[in-house]
Amino acid sequence: MRADLVPGAVFPDYELSDHTGKHRKLSELQGQDPMIVVLSRGSYCPKDRRQHEGLLELHGEMEVGYCRLVTISTDNITDTYEFRTGLDAHWPFLSDPRRIIQKDLDIAEYTHPEHNPMIPHTIVLEPGLIIYKVYVGLLVLRPTVGGRSAPGFAGRD
């Protein structure tokens, strides 16, 4: 990840096509709310699929708390649409097959040359695309006291 993208900095206002082909800017998707941006490896990855299954439950809690969610992957629009639909997700999935974000943020995953994905990141943004926290790795559900699942992060922050 670029060294200048730290808490307090402004995250770039990328404009990409969503799962329907419509061009969307991150700032427009965010509005005046906090937002979580998931930089995904893509629909081919079983770990990413599991992460997004967990995000389905979390998304309901986020909506009640006026927090936005967006997923960005290097999948083409067709794969992005199928991934979102297959999950029955109701938040925007953005498609970046030209790998604009991967190159700009310097997050190419060198371990998987066939799909050339991004290293997964989860970025928590305050209103105005201001970075609150950057997590490297996949969001996973971990057990908690009482047997309920709680979100946690695999990787480092």
Question: Which residues fall in each region the model found?
Answer:
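Chalcogenol-based redox active-site neighborhoods
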Residues: 1-157
